């Protein structure tokens, strides 16, 4: 089971697609990873982790942010998700030859998203 979901985000305080697509049970596991100077702009009901000012604006900011997240998470199972993910489900015919929907993909239901995060090991 994924214990924590980290969402690194910059300059998108009013447009958190991934967070808004998650079921409430998973939103409670979210940690938004932000720059300290933007903290006052965010009001989502989740935890916040501010990246060190020393890495803000560097050409390796994303890589250093991922390392910072890794160190913060420690030994738990966690996910790092982009902040603008539409969460979709793919038709199973692509790997089982048995179709489970009319189209090739569709937006995942809240139950499917929750199941995905509960089963990923």
Predicted features along the sequence, with ranges:
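Short, conserved clusters of charged catalytic residues that mark active-site
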Residues: 17, 64, 115
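N-proximal low-complexity "stem/linker" segments adjacent to membrane-targeting elements
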Residues: 1-24
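Active-site-proximal specificity loops/subdomain of glycosyltransferases
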Residues: 33-81, 86-112
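An acidic/histidine-cluster motif and surrounding catalytic segment
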Residues: 14-15, 25-26, 32, 40
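Short, hydrophobic beta-strand segments that form beta-sheet elements in well-ordered domains
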Residues: 5-9, 28-37
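A short, amphipathic alpha-helix used for macromolecular contacts
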Residues: 114-121
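A general structural motif
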Residues: 2, 27, 75-76
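A generic secondary-structure signal
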Residues: 20-24, 68-72, 119
């Amino acid at each position: 089971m994924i214990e924590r979901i980290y969402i690194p985000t910059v300059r998108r305080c009013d447009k958190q697609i991934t967070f808004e697509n998650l079921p409430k049970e998973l939103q409670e596991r979210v940690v938004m990873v932000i720059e300290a100077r933007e903290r006052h702009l965010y009001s989502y009901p989740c935890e916040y982790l501010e990246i060190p000012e020393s890495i803000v604006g560097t050409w390796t900011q994303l890589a250093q942010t991922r390392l910072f997240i890794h160190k913060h998470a420690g030994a738990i199972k966690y996910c790092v998700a982009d902040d603008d993910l539409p969460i979709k489900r793919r038709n199973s015919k692509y790997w089982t030859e048995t179709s489970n929907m009319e189209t090739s993909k569709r937006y995942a239901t809240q139950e499917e998203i929750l199941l995905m995060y509960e089963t990923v090991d």
